[in-house]
């Protein structure tokens, strides 16, 4: 078996079932890994505030020696909330993205820690339906300021018009920012070189763990970087094709069939 010291887990479509549950088998498997001293790190696009329930389910909430990577790698923090590393947008970045989404007739939400600033637009954002635990504040763009922290931006919109609009994004923006879909109806905008792999690289440097000792599990485009980077990259059976293409392992089952539990049992817990 690989000498895995850290397991990085995406949430939606990976660790969680479609109805957003952690099954008993999955929780037991993660506990068995933690009992062996293996770090279990939720690695997500969400802010820490939206993770409280799941960290509580895992028994790692509020712990000084447990860690979470949020905002797709933009924030590396202890589960106490203490920040180890942070990369954010400038106000000018948000202004440029707002200009682009207005041109494409798309909504844009700017996220500042646990608060989502929903910039008023002709198109309604669907982001509140994805993360009801967050605080949503409707604003005009003029209400935003350079004194605010902007962790990332999102565009949550109906899949068909969103996919069509993505094809029209100004090409230079792909050189300036990280732009990727994390769900069918969710496009994420992050600072350049902020993705899950960079967040994990910063965390393992802090912990003294080698890249080869990391197992990463995911299913969507925002998981691709960490699955390609990790010593053991695991794609769910339900993963998008580009993620499966870079994975070391593709599970024979989906997230609804406890694929993460299977992968940990097979590649971490199983005795030789």
Language-model regions, residue ranges each:
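Mg2+-dependent phosphoryl-transfer enzymes with acidic/Ser/Thr/Gly-rich catalytic loops
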Residues: 2-6, 23, 188-272
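Asp-based phosphoryl-transfer active-site loop
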Residues: 3-18
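Active-site phosphate-binding/coordination module
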Residues: 24-124
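Residue-level signal for inorganic ion chemistry
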Residues: 33, 72, 153, 227, ...
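Structural detector of well-ordered beta-strand residues that form the stable sheet scaffold
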Residues: 41, 69, 109, 180, ...
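Short, hinge-like loop/turn segments at secondary-structure boundaries
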Residues: 57-61, 85-87, 125-129, 196-198, ...
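Short, structured coil segments at secondary-structure junctions
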Residues: 58, 64, 72, 172-175, ...
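Conserved acidic, metal-coordinating active-site core of Asp-based
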Residues: 100, 104-217
